[in-house]
């Protein structure tokens, strides 16, 4: 009984962590025209995982984030400023 409860708890926590990781926005460079060195590093250093292309599953995600990074006036994060944040600056 306790073993299955622990297993269910671990499963629920791992699913919630995976959901948070996949929905968290990828940070990109804030300066327009400057490359994302993390993306360049990932594309130039393929992982060696038993004969398969290790980073092939990341390619669509990285392409999608690099297309979406240009947002209003070149701001990369896409976070809308509230009036409180504007008043602080």
From Swiss-Prot:
Cellular component GO terms, alphabetical: extracellular region; synapse
Question: Organism's domain of life?
Answer: Eukaryota
Q: Which UniProt keywords apply?
A: Cleavage on pair of basic residues, Neuropeptide, Secreted, Signal
Tissue distribution of the protein? Expressed in mammary, salivary and thyroid gland. Expressed in the brain, in a cluster of cells located between the locus coeruleus (LC) and Barrington's nucleus, as well as in few cells of the dorsomedial hypothalamic nucleus and the amygdala.
**Matching InterPro entries:** Neuropeptide_S
Propeptide residue span(s): 24-69
Protein's job: May play an important anorexigenic role. Modulates arousal and anxiety as well as increases locomotor activity. Binds to its receptor NPSR1 with nanomolar affinity to increase intracellular calcium concentrations.
Protein name stated in the entry: Neuropeptide S
Gene field = Nps
According to its UniProt record, where is this protein located?
Answer: Secreted
- Which is a Pfam family this sequence falls into? Neuropeptide_S
The processes (GO biological process) annotated in the record are: neuropeptide signaling pathway; positive regulation of action potential; positive regulation of circadian sleep/wake cycle, wakefulness; positive regulation of synaptic transmission, GABAergic; positive regulation of synaptic transmission, glutamatergic; synaptic transmission, glutamatergic; visual learning
Residues annotated as signal peptide = 1-23
């Amino acid at each position: 009984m306790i073993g299955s409860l622990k297993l269910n708890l671990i499963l629920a926590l791992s699913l919630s962590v995976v959901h948070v990781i996949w929905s968290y926005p990828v940070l990109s460079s804030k300066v327009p025209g400057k490359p994302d060195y993390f993306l360049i590093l990932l594309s130039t250093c393929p992982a060696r995982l038993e004969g398969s292309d290790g980073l092939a599953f990341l390619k669509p995600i990285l392409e999608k984030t690099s297309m979406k990074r240009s947002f209003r006036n070149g701001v990369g994060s896409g976070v809308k400023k509230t009036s409180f944040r504007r008043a602080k600056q």
